Amino acid sequence: AQIVAEELHLDTESIVAALLHDTIEDTTATHEELAKLFSPTVADLVEGVSKLTRIQYATKEDEQMENLRKMLIAMSKDIRVILIKISDRLHNMRTMEYQTPEKQKQKSFETMEIYAPIAHRLGMQKMKWELEDLSLKYLDPVGYREITEALDEKAAEYDGFMSAVHDRIVTRLKEEGIDATVYGRMKHPYSIYRKMYTQNKSLDDVFDLFAFRVIVDTVADCYNVLGIIHDLFKP
């Protein structure tokens, strides 16, 4: 419920439903009782989350896709159902260290195959990145540790580089009279992991460790910025 309230900023009924999301599944409470005590909408949300909880996940690709379709169908009825479910899974992943190794791998696999892709489809990139990173932590602990430790060791160097690039872009845009907001970030561990292990590269051989985003007001400015970026940093 805390994730629903503080990170997704959903409405009151969603927060109440998040607090009650296991009620139908784990107690004798019924949809009718929840509707009477709270509201029909809260009851519908809780019931929707319970239906997703009952989906059985498997390892075969076609079965995973069927699970994905079921969740997408649930989304079409009320998007808040899937938002609550993804928030619940994120909370579970954040506290996964208290589970058995077998449970950790099972839940991490589900998260990587089902929840992270749906978060991506919904444009919830920050949540998607965290779900992927936490899943990697349990699916390949050694690989996760190698990457995070290497990133920690080079944090000061990388921060300095990103700051320099950011300032260079901002300065040039001001010179060109373009009003823009520039954001920079380090790629997250799972993204780097995929590049390293699928292409058999070391961290030093991965050149796209950083991502920058330039927000402008018009399409014309967008194309102007693209030209400026290409001028500053040859593609």
Range-by-range predicted roles:
Residues I15, A43-S50, K128, E132:
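Short, well-structured alpha-helical segments
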Residues Q2-E7, T27, H31, R54-M71, ...:
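Nucleic-acid processing machinery
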Residues I84-S87:
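Hydrophobic transmembrane helix module of multi-pass membrane transport proteins
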Residues H21-G48, M124:
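Hydrophobic or amphipathic alpha-helical targeting/insertion segments
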Residues L10-L20, T41, L45, V81, ...:
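Alpha-helical scaffolds flanking conserved acidic
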Residues T23, L45, V49-R54, Q64, ...:
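Transcription initiation cofactors for RNA polymerase, centered on bacterial
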